[in-house]
Amino acid sequence: MRTALRTSLAAFSAAAIALTVSALPRSAGAQTLNDPTIVAIFDAANTWDMETGALAVKRAKTHDVHEFAEMLVRDHKAVRQQGRDLAKKLGVTPTPPANFGMAKDHAAAMAKLSKLTGAAFDKAFLAHEVAYHKAVLDAVTTTLLPALQNVEVKDLVTKVGPAFQAHMIKAQSLLDSYPTK
């Protein structure tokens, strides 16, 4: 049951992000995927991982998961601020996409994680982080970077890619080595 919940939460998180982001430019009548929209998505992605990280700081059972969660909050806070500073410098007003379904998806993931405690929480959180970072990296590579027009915004998104990759790898490593008892 716990493995099924962890797997379904991770799959839900990844699918929600991938579907919402990949559908943006193709939907009939959808808002154009432009720099202000991408800046809003970038900001939201960092904010949401800060929120899941903050939940894990409070609920993590193991020291390693707690430290990982603190790192997520710290790293994503810094990256979010870099994005906000750049948007301000460029005079870009972040404009979330119409029907920003990812916000509802994040709320649902947080609600599911909030119901868990102990090892079940740790494992579900780590699985979520693997899926979340993979989905964000896939969306950045296939949808967001190709649509970005501003070189400075593109450079920032490209620059933080390795940190997102490192978070995904660390979460997977912690999940793979999580004590079975």
Predicted segments with their positions:
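His/Met- and acidic-residue-enriched segments that coordinate or traffic transition-metal cofactors
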Residues: 3-10, 19-181
